[in-house]
Amino acid sequence: MFGSEAEFVSIADVRTMSDEELRTIDLFLYNRTWIAGPIEAVKPVADILRQYGAKIILDMDDYWHLGTGHSFYKHYHETNMSAVVAEHVKLADAVITTTTYLRDEILKLNKNVTICENVPHLLYDQFKPQPTTSERLRFGYFGAAQHTEDVALLELPLSRLCDDHTLENRYMLYLAGWNEGNPIYQQYEQVFSNKGKNNNYGRIQAADIYSYVGGYNFIDVALAPLRDNKFNRLKSELKVTEAAWMNKAIIASNVCMYADCIQDGWDGVLVDEKQPKKWYKSMKAMINEPAMVREMADRLTAKMQKRLDIDTITRRRFNLYKNVARDISIKELHAIPQGEPKQHDSGDVDGAGEQCDGLPLAADEPCNA
């Protein structure tokens, strides 16, 4: 889109760059950090990156303080990683994030923040729906290996679903991201298969970040459970966006960034953490009324594709790149019409690359990914 205006180069290790090469860089773009630590090294490395006048922009899609239930919490605590990431946020010339909620936290450390929502690019084939059909209504969970507490929200509802014999052979539950030998997904499987008792369960293999969305072609309804805690409230609405682009219905936890996108009962379903029975009731209603699922999916797709225009958001991002490189402040930039979101209307310290070629497997079939 901007090939005539800029040249983008992917650098595997900046330490291998010569001074001559460093002089050619106007702007460094980093996801969360430019160095993993220690904290004492963050500023010296930033100074090296800037020594010939280059600027630094961070992309931030997750909060840097993890809850005690997060699978990375121990690692973050032992390595002081939350402080390391916060130091990066403070020192960056500008920060890009995805929602007003996370922006408000970043503003406490860095005033140069702008919002560029997650939006799929159709040049990536995985975002072009190639739906499959089934006589059963198919539910799917697409989450990385850091959601043990979130998946636990489904344990009782899915157990009740399994025990409802009026629904037998009328639905499927797919766990996407299955990775043979991964203990987290083995735990997830215990929930989705009701400890092996649900015959309506199957797997979708793990895939990398460039193909995992293809797994949506084998489901009809996405499940997006999240605990209502600060870390999760500062995540993006990515799971809603994925479902919308793939023209799927969604049942999601009633967490702020999801609630900004979904009108409960119209273009999706929102479930309060204190109402776990609603997961079961909503899934049963969808199994009994598949036409409702199709209507919800179409409404969600129309809404989200209207809200998230790739050209507008990409232009906003590129204008930010140009103006930071030219040393125009974010305050000045925001005075220029950019299509910036005006209110809370808009993944993860999560490894989105832990899924595979998107082909469903039987419950007992191994994955070779």
PLM region spans:
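C-terminal alpha-helical cap of glycosyltransferases
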Residues: 310-347, 367
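Nucleotide-sugar-dependent
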Residues: 149, 199, 203-242, 252-260
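A charged, aromatic-enriched C-terminal amphipathic alpha-helix characteristic of glycosyltransferases
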Residues: 274, 290-326
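Conserved catalytic-core segment of nucleotide-activated headgroup transferases in glycan assembly
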Residues: 1, 121-126, 132-214
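Conserved acidic donor-binding segment of nucleotide-sugar-dependent glycosyltransferases
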Residues: 264-265, 269-276, 285-290
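Active-site proximal beta-strand in glycosyltransferases
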Residues: 28, 49-66
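Donor nucleotide-sugar binding/catalytic pocket of nucleotide-sugar-dependent glycosyltransferases
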Residues: 90-127
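Membrane-proximal helix-turn-helix segments that form the acceptor-binding/catalytic region
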Residues: 75-94
